[in-house]
């Protein structure tokens, strides 16, 4: 089973980022390291230390992206219906704690953006809503305190 659920758009962004790391950034940092080595003593060479730190950060990001690209499932490949909430669903909910209605979209963890109301299915709210139907009240369990929401409408 895939560890990451992502949209096609996010997948393409990650593929482009990996290409840039491999084709542009990695060769540039390799050149910086080579130039720093040519300066002589590496024990007090700030350019060398900075380049090594940047190389380590680039390697970490490259490894993260490769892990995602080896273990993903496209959201578009997940079957959706307007009968029950699933990843990719846009739903209207009533939040009793905030005393307001909200429209949110459930997305994979790699696509979440709370400021755009894109909520990860891995969050307490996302977990509480998945596989629920219109009209259902659910309790969202958070570390601070649980709260209730009601599914008003499954838009798509």
Curated annotation (Swiss-Prot):
Q: Which UniProt keywords apply?
A: Coiled coil, DNA-binding, Transcription, Transcription regulation
Q: Read off the Pfam families from this record.
A: GreA_GreB, GreA_GreB_N
Q: Which GO terms describe its biological process?
A: DNA-templated transcription elongation; regulation of DNA-templated transcription elongation
- Look up the domain of life of the source: Bacteria
Q: Which InterPro entries match?
A: GreA/GreB_C_sf, TF_GreA/GreB_CS, Tscrpt_elong_fac_GreA, Tscrpt_elong_fac_GreA/B, Tscrpt_elong_fac_GreA/B_C, Tscrpt_elong_fac_GreA/B_fam, Tscrpt_elong_fac_GreA/B_N, Tscrpt_elong_fac_GreA/B_N_sf
Q: Which residues form a coiled coil?
A: 1-84
Q: Name one GO molecular function term.
A: RNA polymerase binding
Signal peptide (residue range)? none
Give the similarity note.
Answer: Belongs to the GreA/GreB family.
PANTHER family for the chain: TRANSCRIPTION ELONGATION FACTOR GREA (PTHR30437:SF4)
Q: What does this protein do?
A: Necessary for efficient RNA polymerase transcription elongation past template-encoded arresting sites. The arresting sites in DNA have the property of trapping a certain fraction of elongating RNA polymerases that pass through, resulting in locked ternary complexes. Cleavage of the nascent transcript by cleavage factors such as GreA or GreB allows the resumption of elongation from the new 3'terminus. GreA releases sequences of 2 to 3 nucleotides.
Name under which the protein is recorded: Transcription elongation factor GreA
């Amino acid at each position: 089973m895939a560890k990451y659920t992502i949209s096609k758009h996010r997948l393409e962004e990650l593929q482009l980022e990996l290409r840039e790391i491999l084709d542009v950034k990695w060769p540039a940092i390799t050149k910086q390291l080579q130039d720093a080595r040519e300066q002589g003593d590496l024990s007090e060479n700030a350019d060398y230390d900075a380049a090594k730190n940047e190389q380590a950060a680039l390697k970490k990001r490259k490894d993260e992206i490769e892990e995602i690209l080896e273990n993903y499932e496209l959201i578009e490949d997940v079957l959706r219906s307007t009968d029950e909430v699933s990843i990719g669903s846009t739903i209207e909910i009533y939040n009793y704690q905030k005393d307001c209605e909200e429209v949110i979209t459930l997305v994979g963890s790699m696509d979440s953006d709370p400021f755009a109301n894109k909520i990860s299915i891995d969050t307490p709210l996302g977990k509480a809503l998945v596989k629920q139907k219109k009209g259902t009240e659910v309790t969202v369990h958070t570390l601070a305190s649980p709260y209730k929401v009601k599914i008003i409408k499954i838009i798509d």
